[in-house]
Amino acid sequence: MTQSLIHKFLAKPMSGVEIEKRSFDIIDSEAGPLTVPRDQWEVIRRMIHTCGDPSIAPLVRFSPDAIQAGVSALRAGAPLYVDSNMIRSGLSLARLRSVCPAYTSAMITCNVAAPDVAAESSRTSLPRSYFAVRKARATLDGGIAVFGNAPVALLEINRMIAEGEIKPALVIGLPVGFVHVEESKTELISLPVPSIIMMGRRGGSTLAVSIVHALCTVAECTQETTG
């Protein structure tokens, strides 16, 4: 009988921290010389680590001020609006608090399951995500918007930004799918608002979460450098 591979691992065990470090070493090695600023690479490598696919690197786009805007917003304890409860569950409160101790779970909002949102969606036959983001105006104005699911919601926040209704601190635009996805991202990156997107149809909640966590890492590192 062939020995299970777990025995080889147990013969030379690695902790979770060691495995993560080794993973990032592999990502850095395969990437070669950096062609983007170090802070942007911190975000991209975290995304690669999340999905295991280095080919996504050229698809990630940053507005010129995206990293600094995101770091500043996190340090100030800006509220977050997320377009799915999966993102809300995936965000680490401990990581957010490592940047700003004032963060609480109540500062991460998702309205897709709100009864009034569901009722309006049923009445109009429009997606819940559309009404959910409209309900979040107060959070979005000055807050961090994290989209990993709903392109229609991103289209609506794009409209609100373009028409001067809100001015988010940062918009992370990673909706995934085939309908209204690519154009929602292209429109976002053209707007005068700090943003991070992933071109094309790919994206998703886990990648959106990884961007927030990477920004927390950047914020911690720069605090140590300047502290």
Language-model regions, residue ranges each:
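Charged, compositionally biased N-terminal leader segments and the immediate start
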Residues: 1-38
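C-terminal functional extensions of proteins
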Residues: 169, 179-227
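A short, well-structured juxtamembrane/interface segment
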Residues: 58-75
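N-terminal glycine-rich anion-binding loops that anchor highly charged ligand groups
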Residues: 35-49
